[in-house]
């Protein structure tokens, strides 16, 4: 196996793990990093989706007891059934729109320049949302994921649709959207984690079936390396983020998004790199 390819797979895995659950867009970072590393062949998008599987396994491990409790409680506990229903409701809008517009989105938006614009716009939205949160005088309406209603879940699910635009961020859309709809910051963050499970599992399965030719003996090793790197880095990131949101807002991520997006645009339009 080519050592250069191994290094690229590990780098992209770490990028995925560190950015999947932060409001900075993992897909956007993978597109930019893949272009910079010249890791953008016909199977690159499949690689990007498959290594997300490693990142979501980190969430499953972190919440393994909660997930086991929900699954075992489905036959007898109303709260487990209600929570599962909320996850399903919040997942449907993004899946429906994703299946409808997948080809057009990948053809038009899966390149660094559109990602850069989305990063800047998303950063501005986060700044606006955080300013609005500071002006609120009443406490959040929903203080636990168990208090979510189906309508709350639907609203967060609609917000998640913005993440179909690379660079907007799935976690950013769901967390900021949830906060605007009255969810406590930690509740919005945790619900965003749970929403990632069906979305990423589904995307991984879909890409695996659709592009099964990408899974050769050589590429399978790269996929595994990338997924392992994503798992380890995502596990560290998830634990850190849960502590961070207890006492901080997302303003720093907004400014990072804007700065990174402007940097990508500057690099592209100055001719330093050709963002193909």
From Swiss-Prot:
Keywords: Antibiotic resistance, Cell inner membrane, Cell membrane, Cell shape, Cell wall biogenesis/degradation, Hydrolase, Membrane, Peptidoglycan synthesis, Transmembrane, Transmembrane helix
Enzymatic class: hydrolase
Reaction(s) catalysed (UniProt annotation): di-trans,octa-cis-undecaprenyl diphosphate + H2O = di-trans,octa-cis-undecaprenyl phosphate + phosphate + H(+)
InterPro entries noted in UniProt: UppP
Membrane topology: Multi-pass membrane protein
Superkingdom per UniProt: Bacteria
Gene Ontology annotations of biological process type: cell wall organization; peptidoglycan biosynthetic process; regulation of cell shape; response to antibiotic
Localization (cell): Cell inner membrane
A Pfam family assignment: BacA
GO CC terms, sorted: plasma membrane
EC number: 3.6.1.27
Principal location: membrane
Disulfide bonds: none
GO molecular-function terms, A-Z: undecaprenyl-diphosphatase activity
Transmembrane segments: 4-24, 46-63, 83-103, 108-128, 187-207, 217-237, 252-272
Note: Bacitracin is thought to be involved in the inhibition of peptidoglycan synthesis by sequestering undecaprenyl diphosphate, thereby reducing the pool of lipid carrier available.
Family: Belongs to the UppP family.
Stated role: Catalyzes the dephosphorylation of undecaprenyl diphosphate (UPP). Confers resistance to bacitracin.
Full protein name: Undecaprenyl-diphosphatase 1
